[in-house]
Amino acid sequence: AQTSTSDTLAFSINNAYELPTMMGAGLMWNHNHQWKVGFDYTLQKWGSLGYPTYDAKNNEPWALRDGVYMDRSKFNLGFQYCYAENGRASFLKRVHYRAGVSYATPYYKVNGVDGPKEISVSAGFGIPIMNGYNNRSQLNISGQWVKSSAKDLIKENSFRINIGFTFNEDWFKKWKMQ
């Protein structure tokens, strides 16, 4: 025969998990439908969120505590060039060439120290996909180098390859029926 006993304490916290408020603004300059330069700023308000934590040091039960996270800022700068975005130019003149950089602050702490800041550089191109009724969709290919680092923490370098499709169809086009 086997017997067992257990002592279980249950703690519950209402509204324990929340998502941060996110605000952003951006500007883009378009020169002659060939050159585009854009800047974007995003702020995520992680610092105002409570997070359920257990204080093992003082043997306190689970409670919502502030100051676990920090507000996160991200700055992006991007550039695009396309010689002939719309038209019947040669294939290479219709390709969209892109490059960008970004910088982001962390939203979390590791052992009381700010987490890693992130810097990235990317470059890529958009290959036009054309058929009889659509000339605006693209196959997008890019490479991105990302460096994450923080004081007294691991430093990380990574390279990402991104492949995606952009379908710029006329979804709400008014068709004439005869």
For the regions a protein language model found, what residue spans apply to each?
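Outer-membrane beta-barrel porins/channels
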Residues: 1-178
